[in-house]
Regions:
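Rossmann-like NAD(P)-binding element
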Residues: 31-94, 100, 118-128
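Hydrophobic beta-strand scaffold residues
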Residues: 26, 106-107, 252
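Rossmann-fold dinucleotide-binding core
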Residues: 67-69, 88-188
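Helical "substrate-binding/catalytic lid" subdomain
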Residues: 125, 135, 158-286
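NAD(P)+-binding Rossmann beta1-loop-alpha1 motif at the extreme N-terminus of oxidoreductases
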Residues: 1-52, 78, 115-117, 281
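Conserved dinucleotide-binding and phosphotransfer motif residues
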Residues: 22, 102, 248
Length: 292
């Protein structure tokens, strides 16, 4: 089949290559002319035969909204837009309504796989009407990992991005658990080879995982992570997961704590701990440390 792909960055560029390897035609557009196949969205749409499928792989928020707005004016009834970026699931219904007024279908798709997806395939979670999903199915089949699993029609519009959001929340908590275990192992004198302890966990243990494999890779490159600063950004999906939990009265202690740990990583000196130190001094005369 033919596919229009908007956004050819680290993810989009590799996705274009994987889809082409499966025998499909991909016409890609990106603001960077060095990687684009066409010079504009209008040219991209013009090169596709109807019913068209256009996959949007640009940053969430304003960039996605402006791309969908432009496609709404260029596409025809029966065409389908897929949002494969990390959009907030609450935006999906809005996009579906906007496009639906012009007879254009909409599918949201959460994509996981990162820079490894080109060779290993991408895990896909998508939401939308069955009729629209069917038009995109050959692309889903090309992108997914080999085998029975790795993709799912999660439900109606918004379900794909919601599932990906929860996936990322779980990822936050798993990474935090590995990080806490690593720090404790590094702290004690009795454990003399933390890296090899992590490596030993890769086979036969209940905590083996791809994230653990990546942790071992990182320790092979920098055994004590001395070259790194302890600073971790958050993409936004961890926050959205916690907000969704609040909205639905679902307890999420591990994921919430992992998000707050990232906030703490950005502080050179904790204002909260200053207040706690001051209070301990006030009520108990406990010693405080002054700035040097």
């Amino acid at each position: 089949m033919e596919l229009g792909l908007v956004g050819l960055g680290k993810m989009g560029g590799n996705m274009r290559e994987r889809i082409r390897r499966a025998g499909h035609t991909v016409i890609g557009y990106d603001r960077n002319p060095d990687v684009a196949d066409v010079h504009s969205l209008e040219e991209l749409v013009g090169k596709l035969k109807g019913p068209r499928v256009v996959w949007v792989m640009v940053p969430a928020g304003a960039a996605t909204q402006s791309t969908i707005d432009e496609l709404a004016e260029l596409l025809s009834p029966g065409d389908v837009v897929v949002d494969g970026g990390n959009s907030r699931w609450t935006d999906d219904e809005k996009h579906a309504v906007e496009l639906g007024l012009k007879g254009i279908g909409f599918v949201d798709c959460g994509v996981s796989g990162g820079v490894w997806g080109l060779e290993n395939g991408y895990a896909l979670m998508y939401g939308g009407d069955a009729e629209n999903v069917a038009k995109v199915q050959p692309v889903f089949d090309a992108l997914k990992p080999e085998g029975e699993f790795g993709s799912v029609h999660a439900g109606k519009v918004g379900a794909g991005h919601f599932a990906k959001m929860v996936h990322n929340g779980i990822e936050y908590a798993m990474m935090q658990a590995y990080a806490e275990g690593w720090e404790l192992l590094e702290k004690v004198d009795s454990v003399t080879d933390v890296r090899e302890v992590f490596r030993s966990w890769q086979e036969g243990t209940v905590i083996r995982s791809w994230l653990l494999d990546l942790a071992v890779n990182a320790l092979d490159e920098d055994e004590h992570l001395d070259r790194l600063r302890g600073f971790a950004a958050d993409s936004g999906e961890g926050r959205w997961t916690v907000e969704a939990a609040i909205d639905n009265a679902v307890p999420l202690p591990a994921i919430t704590a992992s998000l707050f740990a990232r906030f703490a990583s950005r502080q050179d000196d904790s204002p909260q701990m200053k207040m706690i130190a001051a209070l301990r001094n006030q009520f108990g005369g406990h010693a405080v440390e002054s700035k040097k």
